[in-house]
Amino acid sequence: MKAIIYIAFFLISASAFAQTALDSIILKKANEYRDSLCLPKLEFSKSCFVAAESQAAFQMKDLSKITHDQNGSDIGDRYKKASSSSRFGYLGEIIAACGKNFRDSDSLINEKIAKDLIEIWKKSKDHNAILTSPRMKYAGASAMIAVSKIGIRGWTRYDIRAVMVLSDTK
């Protein structure tokens, strides 16, 4: 009986957070960009991911808004809530919103979305400074997507809200 309870607890704990394929590709593309600048790669951080996921989900509630604020809380509050520690060092949060239409047959949608998000962040002076800061060692990215038909056969609209949280501490 103890073994069954442990297995159930382990499965629930392990599934409490889950990166999507797109989330992983975003981090991969961010590391490719950093590598092109001879910067160290970012290591995945569960705390950064959970903080990013919380903000991305919040952004999806109202597609007309894009903000770093979440009902009076900021990135530090979200990171502390996601982390096992109440202390953190240097934190950064980069956010993006975009909408794209893709053919239903397109097999590279996630790759294209991730590439577009990195380009958006590169073009923003402040977001690029966070993304390319040598102090940053850990990161987690979360992208949420609202999908809708656009009235043209074979095409779908993707409205994306993405957040990446970066930190110098795990």
What do these predicted regions represent?
Residues 3-14:
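Sec-dependent N-terminal signal peptides
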Residues 2-4, 128-129:
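Short secondary-structure capping/junction motifs at helix and strand boundaries
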Residues 18-19, 106:
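A generic structural signal for short
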Residues 19-82, 137-140, 144:
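Short, well-ordered surface patches within globular domains
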